Amino acid sequence: MRKGRFLGCVMGMSFLLFTNAAWGVDLVGHRGARGLAPENTLPSFARALSLGVTVLELDTAITKDSVIVVSHDPILNPNITRDKYGKWLEKPGPAIHSLTFTELQQYDVGRLKPNTKYANSFPEQKALDGTRIPRLVDLFSLVKKSGNEQVRFFIELKVSPHKPEETLDPETYAKRVIDLIHKEGMAARASILSFDWRTLQVVQKIAPEISTIYLSIQQRAFDNIATEKPEGSLWTAGFQHKDHGSVPRMVKAAGGKIWSPYFGDLTEAQLKEAHDLGLQVGVWTVNEPGDSKKMLDVGVDGITTDRPDVLRQIMAERGMKLPVATPVQP
């Protein structure tokens, strides 16, 4: 979700995922281009490809009949979801793992629910009624259709140690996604990211050719590091802040090569420490121009944004080389 030096690391290829020599800083389209089109949908990814990004960031879930789909929420989000009658969901749910893919396709995710805080956050998102939650394989097909052989994928596995009932266990979940990545020939272009570091430990063990990205956030609403808790965090696979002294050192101890913190948590001292440890650092989710400029100034390796068009303009004004645009229709 963050900065970008994500080049892929298969069969001796460099782990420089965020430091792509072609353009230096990865421009990562968050859920495609969430600020412009319905999130995690084919129109959103098509918009990002048409603008030109180095990486497509996306989230995954798995249906009752084992179809890997692209969705941020393990349970359907009432802020973006209407049923087959066009009625907005009144509360979260049902869980995607309780639905077959055919059942899931009855839901429309092409519009933000009006007059909600969520909708107000993305005033320029274009509604596209009738848009459905896609399969991961559909996204791979769209990219192949675009002819873009350089764009990479940051694939988040949505697992929570506090809500194991909402998803498959980390081992099964990771293996199914990895199997599809290999089947589609995308291992060299895919990175798996998660806030639940247990999942990343599984990936490093069973598919070391696929790079991992360690997500972190230390905010009141969500904190997967839990520095203030004597018992530590359930999210970090046993690698605790009290034992290592900093998040970069936790990532390093976990065998990670890429750290992706929430941009508001990152300090210049942490960035320097991470780089000194040999880690790449990509930040998420940066939408305000001033914040994007600051992140570029301090030297992050990649920036994840809902507005790739805005970040591209900032990069262009600085004379930075831009990723190729490959216009495509979903």
Regions found by a protein language model. Give the residues of each.
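Positively charged n-region of N-terminal signal peptides that target proteins for export
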Residues: 1-5
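General helical structural elements
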Residues: 6-9, 34-35
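Phosphate-group recognition and catalysis centered on beta-loop-alpha active-site segments
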Residues: 20-330
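Bacterial N-terminal signal peptides
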Residues: 8-19
